[in-house]
Design a protein with these regions (language model features):
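Beta-strand-loop-alpha-helix segment that lines the small-molecule cofactor/substrate pocket
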Residues: 1-41, 56
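Contiguous beta-strand/loop segments that form the cofactor/metal-binding neighborhood of enzyme cores
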Residues: 100-176
Length: 201
């Protein structure tokens, strides 16, 4: 930014919130962009879910969720930087951030958040388990359930949207598969959408 260039960084944007505000202010002052790469927004399954929301296929949305149940053994946190507040953060900042970004991109701004965090199994500075209740600006609720204390392996990483008009769940290894796609008013395109929007990674 000081060199007059736009900046794209890998997550996280910064480890301390004040640093994000400083970087954004510098970018704004210089008429430059400072942003974080969240590549899951480009996945066909995520794009299909976003399009369904934008086309009002759900009608009134009633619930939106992120579920991440991954396994990180204690050795993962013993390298000196994983799980530290200064260099890494916990499950929210390190693992679930891409899913949370996709959910907010799909469903819009969040008005308020209430969270509870813990170290369920692992010993680290930050959290290995987090539950959050979201209140979206469009007056529906959301839930973030994220943990690296799943055993013995990674089980799930998904985003789902539920509304009066249907239910869609995107999962897979990298938010790359449509797991559920069902609407009250289905179209001929729905089956094709599921097939073309799910890809192997």
């Amino acid at each position: 930014l000081l060199g007059g260039k736009h900046v794209i960084v890998e997550k996280p944007a910064a480890m301390i919130p004040e640093h994000i505000y400083e970087l954004q202010a510098l970018a704004d002052k210089s008429n430059l962009m400072y942003t974080v790469m969240h590549q899951n927004r480009l996945n066909p399954a995520v794009v299909a879910l976003k399009r369904a929301v934008d086309e009002n296929r759900f009608g009134k949305i009633t619930l939106a969720t992120v579920r991440l149940r991954w396994c990180r053994l204690q050795e993962y946190y013993e390298d000196g930087w994983h799980g530290t507040w200064l260099m890494d953060g916990g499950v929210i900042n390190q693992q679930a951030i891409h899913h949370i970004d996709a959910l907010q991109w799909i469903c819009g701004p969040v008005r308020s958040v209430v969270s509870a965090n813990s170290n369920a199994l692992n010993k680290l500075e930050a959290e290995d388990t987090s539950i959050s209740l979201l209140n979206f600006e469009d007056n529906f609720l959301g839930i973030i359930e994220a943990t690296t204390a799943a055993r013995p392996r990674d089980f799930e990483a998904s985003i789902s949207v539920l509304g009066e008009g249907g239910f869609v769940e995107v999962g897979g290894r990298a938010l790359n598969k449509i797991v559920n796609w069902e609407f009250v008013e289905s179209t001929d395109q729905d089956r094709l959408e599921v097939k073309k929007s799910s890809e192997e990674v």
